[in-house]
Amino acid sequence: MFLPTTPEEVKRLGWDALDVILVSGDSYIDSPFIGAAVIGKVLLHAGYRVGIIAQPDVSSTADIGRLGLPRLFWGVTAGSVDSMVANYTALKKKRRLDDYTPGGENTRRPDRATIVYSNLIRRFVNSVPSPSALSQRERGLPPPIVLGGIEASLRRVAHYDYWDDAIRRSVLFDAKADYLLYGMAERSVLDLAACLRDGRDPLGVRGLCYIAKEPPAGYLELPSYETVVADKDAFIQMFHTFYRNNDPVSARGLYQKHGDRYLVQNPPAPTETQAELDAIYALDFERRQHPFYEKQGKVKALETIGFSIATHRGCYGECNFCAISVHEGTTVRWRSPESILAEAEQLTKHPDFKGYISDLGGPTANMYGFECPKKLSKGICTAKRCIYPQVCPLMPVDHQPQIELLKKVRRLPGVKKVFVASGLRYDLILCDQTHGNEYLREVVEHHVSGQMKVAPEHVEDNVLRLMGKPGRGALLEFKRRFERLNRQSGKQQFLTYYLIAAHPGCTEADMQRVKEFASRELKIHPQQVQVFTPTPSTYSTLMYYTERDPFTGQPIFVEKDLRRKARQKEIVTDHQGHKGAQRKTSKRPS
């Protein structure tokens, strides 16, 4: 079933009021790939009455107030993408299109949507007469506002904002909200809802951020907001501590002073067990837009997520420009084959399914089914990364589980083709001496749509080091194997290379060498080139703001002039006579 979004739907369900109202910057797509839908269905399955208001009109309180007041809390998310990333290009031009808005026109998601929606809710709540049967109001309090989603998660502590070109406070202060749940948050939101329902103090919930007058005992102190605004060295120190305390096994709680109050971040929620993941993806998602919003126009995102299957969560690639580490986590956890097969079978029964599974994968497709046992028991290593600069010998890289999974899914009745579109880490394939070639052969022969996406992002060693990406040697060896397997299979398939221009440390001379390398070694004229966007809470953004390598302290070149950023991209793409399409961060392979 769909979560209700109108009073008429609530009435048809026999509900007198809602426990939770979710507010989202995306249109309401009932899909396991949409965070608001997942959180809503998890709460609904636990017995809570949940409604959703998608992309509310912010010019008045009529839209936000159509479902009344919730008994327990408001849940606010900017949507699947940070609203500033959704609304502006890397060159700070307004985007015309939005894949998550009906009709595709980018007119419904406000800038800094988390803050705007929180303000809108408060305006509505203040307009409601005091007498109410709602449990929070019985205690003399309005229902709390709880922030979530990627925008809130990545802005939960003091952070650099590219669009203001300044350090901003935690979004919890700017939104004047009550709580913030970071990460994937299914377990955290259930714990929070239970506390609010039962009248218990929620401040111990893992994965929760809140504002306090005094710092909690035993938590690590981050340099204050005022300090990091004034001192880039302090900001670097702050980010190191923040980044290192995202692992559920080893993380400490954190606090950061803002003025005369404190932002408190509890340790992260434990990663989901396989049984929990299986249960989440077994919920009854409709995999389409709610009819109320569908009447306003189709959403382009459904073309990608409508019939895709998530096999796992998390990524230990830790690319410095990627936000997955501090949102979804660096520990990979995966669903059981039985759960994935059951979902694939359900897809075949969907009236709109044509036999094609658009993607079977995760943040990185070929991380399914294996993880470091030391990390699982003791937490992440603080002195080194899992697969950079080399794959750690403790990482038991094994593609066999995914090989077997792909075979089983593609053999299901009603399935014509299963694509692996998430993107691959070719260094993992090269590292797997036992099953790496077998896996690549499987993908080449059965799971490519004509082009395989890989993301070297650059080819110059000095830039790759700052990105945290493997060197060009691994790329060339992977290309050689891919081409050999294509010849053996009698197929004409190609590699598509994603590249980044104007990353910290990258010069125009570096991009000229990228162009020459692509022509000489890759035999292509690159099309998929994007200008680096400094998004909150990544190491690359830290480099952009401080103009330093945070790991060595050495100064680095950072291109900040918008025209020269565009020039870096054009050096590689100008032979095409156009500048190419901007690609969404969420679709880039790791």
Language model features with spans:
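Flexible glycine/acidic-rich beta-alpha junction loops that bind and position SAM and/or redox cofactors
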Residues: D82-L91, L154-R156, E186-D191, P215-P216, ...
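Terminal amphipathic helices with adjacent charged low-complexity linkers/tails
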Residues: S59, P202-A234, F239-D247, D260, ...
